[in-house]
Swiss-Prot record:
Transmembrane segments: none annotated. It holds the Pfam family Spt4. A zinc finger (C4-type) spans 19-39. The lineage of its organism: Eukaryota, Viridiplantae, Streptophyta, Embryophyta, Tracheophyta. This is Transcription elongation factor SPT4 homolog 1. The keyword Transcription applies. It comes from the Eukaryota. Keywords: Activator, Metal-binding, Nucleus, Repressor, Transcription, Transcription regulation, Zinc, Zinc-finger. InterPro entries: RPABC4/Spt4, Spt4, Spt4/RpoE2_Znf, Spt4_sf. May regulate transcription elongation by RNA polymerase II. May enhance transcriptional pausing at sites proximal to the promoter, which may in turn facilitate the assembly of an elongation competent RNA polymerase II complex. Belongs to the SPT4 family. GO terms for molecular function: zinc ion binding. GO terms for cellular component: nucleus.
């Protein structure tokens, strides 16, 4: 996944959301316009109602990754194979079952948060 960098958030206010699968952080409008660079199989740029299903405004911390493949922090957070960009340290919500099924169909691993 992701050689090209993901969009960085254009604002760091309350409109930020994090992808529940890969934890990429962008604004609602950025997810609406271009989807999630790491999770194209969700097709959220085509189905705007899905943004609420696969992203959350409830997350802890942000880390920016310029070269995730070489970063020990990216490996520790399990985001080393994702596109360079801004990621949350943790999300507290699980991906809905329907979206987990989409991950299975796409043969993409989903690791739910440890504490919900």
């Amino acid at each position: 996944m992701g050689e090209a960098p993901a969009q960085i958030p254009t604002s760091f206010g309350h409109e930020l959301r994090a992808c529940l699968r890969c934890r990429l952080v962008k604004t609602y409008d950025q997810f609406r316009d271009s989807g999630c660079e790491n999770c194209p199989f969700f097709k959220i740029e085509d189905d705007h109602e899905r943004i609420v299903d696969v992203t959350t405004p409830n997350f802890n911390g942000i880390i920016s990754m310029m070269d995730p493949r070489r970063s020990w922090a990216a490996r520790w957070l399990r985001i080393g194979k994702f596109a360079p960009g801004c990621y949350t340290l943790a999300v507290s919500e699980a991906l809905p079952e329907e979206m987990q099924f989409i991950c299975q169909q796409a043969r993409v691993q989903y690791v739910p948060p440890k504490r919900i």
